[in-house]
């Protein structure tokens, strides 16, 4: 698709450049706006897929520059990890129809970044600080991400962290009321298996606690701590059982941990104590992370 010119819903012209990578739903390319030097990425997927529709709806809900600026000022922070959203659109190529979304271009995902960092703790603390504020903001809109994993957390050139890929979000607040806990077998193990929360394994709507639990598993990965359930490969049921056992052992203090990693397990213990509808104490979680 390289070289194809596109026009977004705002009438701005873009051109698809080099392929960056492909996933289960589509491909990501570099791109540049024709009217300025703005660099961006363009995600392209078949019109038959619906994940991009979900993502655009999320950005329409949460991406408002003025609202974000007010929220950052209220929280006394200078960064919120939501990528800049430039627009979206659709196009036809040969006999196929496609959707696209235009987003801020970031540098690297945290899975790759942490592979080459010799002393990861300071970076993990910064990533967690950014992500806890980002999730708090998203959760205030009644939305859970549902696919928190190192590949979906990226950094820019200043090592500020961003949460990407809002294709399988859930709305846990509907008409002002929190959804009830309800299991659906068609949604078992939703998300990325190794990082899915227990709620995601059970097929229920992921809520605030599920996102925060998945973020805890990311911390284990970033710190170089093996995920105990990885030995079960893609067996979703066995991974689920292993996570349940792991969390029970964490709560009973039966996990062998180095003192330097105690803060990670304290965080996991805290978020897995939350009830399904409970609003987390994000400030407390930030304090736990600061103790790493």
Swiss-Prot record:
UniProt cross-references to PROSITE patterns, sorted A to Z: PROTEIN_KINASE_ATP, PROTEIN_KINASE_DOM, PROTEIN_KINASE_ST
Catalyzed reactions per annotation: L-seryl-[protein] + ATP = O-phospho-L-seryl-[protein] + ADP + H(+); L-threonyl-[protein] + ATP = O-phospho-L-threonyl-[protein] + ADP + H(+)
Enzyme Commission designation: 2.7.11.1
Matches recorded under InterPro entries: CK1_Ser-Thr_kinase (IPR050235), Kinase-like_dom_sf (IPR011009), Prot_kinase_dom (IPR000719), Protein_kinase_ATP_BS (IPR017441), Ser/Thr_kinase_AS (IPR008271)
Gene Ontology MF annotations: ATP binding; protein serine kinase activity; protein serine/threonine kinase activity
Protein kinase domain location: 14-292
Source species, domain of life: Viruses
Binding site for ATP: 20-28, 43
Keywords noted in UniProt: ATP-binding, Kinase, Nucleotide-binding, Serine/threonine-protein kinase, Transferase
Active site: 147
Keyword Protease: no
Keyword Endoplasmic reticulum: no
Family the UniProt entry places it in: Belongs to the protein kinase superfamily. Ser/Thr protein kinase family. Poxviruses subfamily.
Protein name, as recorded: Probable serine/threonine-protein kinase FPV226
